[in-house]
Amino acid sequence: MANYTAADIKALRERTGAGMMDVKKALDEANGDAEKAIEIIRIKGLKGATKREGRSTAEGLVAAKVSNGVGVMIEVNCETDFVAKADKFIQLADKVLAVAVESGAADLETLLATDVDGKPLSEVVIEEGAVLGEKVVVRRISRIEGATVDAYLHKTSKDLPAQVGVLFAVDGESEAAATAAHDVAVHIAAMAPNYLTREDVPSDLVESERRIAEETAKAEGKPEAALTKIVEGRVTGFYKGEVLVDQAFAKDAKKSVAQILEEAGVKGTAFARFRVGS
């Protein structure tokens, strides 16, 4: 008897994009372990096998502000793009951002509990949502401190408020540091790294990528003697896709982000990237 349910199959299909029978076979082979099944699907190169964790169709905006070496960024969601571009919704987001900056809140729970004219911010958001006729949610907040912090907001559509936001901090305070911080913030918006350095990547994820690279190389018929080099090359490629400082710089692909920062005499210390609905 299978040790997984129809709901498990549905969830795995949504995460990988693979067909129902392929998902069932992978779950059978993995003895019901969803994460192992994802590895199997990726190794076999099944069509559409891409992760879709956290996928959402939410509309809304990202807002950010930097003050005295502290960057604060929020994402506020609504149901339709019609409301997302409405003045009242944008004003509500501005109010939420102001509360986030002034309160010093570093997490969503604290932010939503912050008193605003005698009531918690969460109630203010619900009331404003009722006026707009849609459910409105403050989805997340990020707070980053550094010697220099840059905030960059990007519009994916000229008709909507910013859909992508980035905070990026470096450890220097020079003009060169500020320029580098901004340029790299723009890069982060475009290239969407998940980690600042290789040391930030969870070891189990690296080992998973290593296993996938090895099994894929074997499935491709690569010679045993070449496997180690091939695997290391593919793991390096993984780092170049996921790790900020390893990525090719968007404005000059001949240089890495690490080189851009080094030329400015700084190191990146933290970053956050929000995209509405993802």
From Swiss-Prot:
Point out the coiled-coil segments of this chain: none
For this protein, what is any one GO molecular function term? translation elongation factor activity
Q: Is tRNA processing found in the keyword set?
A: no
- Top-level taxon in the UniProt lineage: Bacteria
A GO CC annotation recorded here is:
cytoplasm
Q: Which UniProt keywords apply?
A: Cytoplasm, Elongation factor, Protein biosynthesis
Residues covered by region (Involved in Mg(2+) ion dislocation from EF-Tu): 80-83
SUPFAM superfamilies, sorted: Elongation factor Ts (EF-Ts), dimerisation domain (SSF54713), UBA-like (SSF46934)
Q: CDD domains given for it?
A: UBA_EF-Ts (cd14275)
Q: Name one Pfam family in it.
A: EF_TS
Localization, per the record, is: Cytoplasm
The similarity comment for this entry is: Belongs to the EF-Ts family.
Q: What does this protein do?
A: Associates with the EF-Tu.GDP complex and induces the exchange of GDP to GTP. It remains bound to the aminoacyl-tRNA.EF-Tu.GTP complex up to the GTP hydrolysis stage on the ribosome.
Record's protein name: Elongation factor Ts
Please name the source species: Pseudarthrobacter chlorophenolicus (strain ATCC 700700 / DSM 12829 / CIP 107037 / JCM 12360 / KCTC 9906 / NCIMB 13794 / A6) (Arthrobacter chlorophenolicus)
Q: What is the lineage of its organism?
A: Bacteria, Bacillati, Actinomycetota, Actinomycetes, Micrococcales
